[in-house]
């Protein structure tokens, strides 16, 4: 849902066009199950500003994109844009069906289901089509808000950067009071 649009860029196409205007900046999300927890990975890659023909602060633009996606998604009346929600739900359902048709993935799911019978290990990290049908738009948005308010957050900055970059994040990223920032 996070890559489906924001208030400022209300569709996937508008978001993609904006990223393209920022020298092809990439932005993506994925979700993984680790033990009994979920890890939401949000990543973005942009060109090093030293390679631009003129001075433009892409890092601040990148941070603003994080703010838009996390804190200003395309939401009205406590739920995501209906059309975007329907599209994303359909895409996920199709991925789940394809994974169930993949013999290796199906076998792996069955292995964990039998090994961890009655425990967390038996729960598919991909989810279930039957459960997806019951999930509502409002529930997904409510869960996002709960995660933003309550979950542990870490930010990793990788690249040709110095420690002063932490100040740029603190000045421009809303969530920094709840976040550990790591430089690599």
Which residue ranges define each predicted feature?
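Active/ligand-binding-proximal structured segments within catalytic/core domains
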Residues: 1-19
């Amino acid at each position: 849902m996070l890559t489906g649009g924001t208030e400022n860029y209300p569709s996937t196409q508008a978001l993609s066009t904006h990223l393209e205007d920022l020298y092809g900046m990439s932005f993506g999300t994925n979700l993984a199950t680790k033990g009994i927890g979920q890890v939401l990975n949000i990543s973005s890659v942009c060109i090093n500003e030293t390679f631009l023909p003129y001075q433009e602060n892409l890092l601040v633009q990148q941070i603003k994109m994080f703010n838009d996606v996390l804190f200003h998604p395309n939401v009205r009346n406590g739920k995501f844009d209906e059309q975007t929600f329907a599209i994303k739900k359909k895409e996920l359902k199709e991925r789940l069906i394809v994974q169930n048709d993949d013999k290796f993935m199906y076998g792996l799911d069955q292995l964990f289901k039998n090994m961890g019978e009655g425990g967390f290990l038996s729960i598919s990290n991909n989810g279930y089509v039957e459960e997806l049908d019951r999930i509502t738009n409002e529930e997904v948005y409510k869960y996002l808000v709960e995660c933003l308010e309550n979950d542990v957050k870490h930010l990793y900055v990788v690249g040709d950067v110095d420690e002063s970059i932490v100040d740029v994040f603190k000045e421009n990223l809303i969530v920094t009071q709840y976040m550990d920032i790591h430089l690599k």
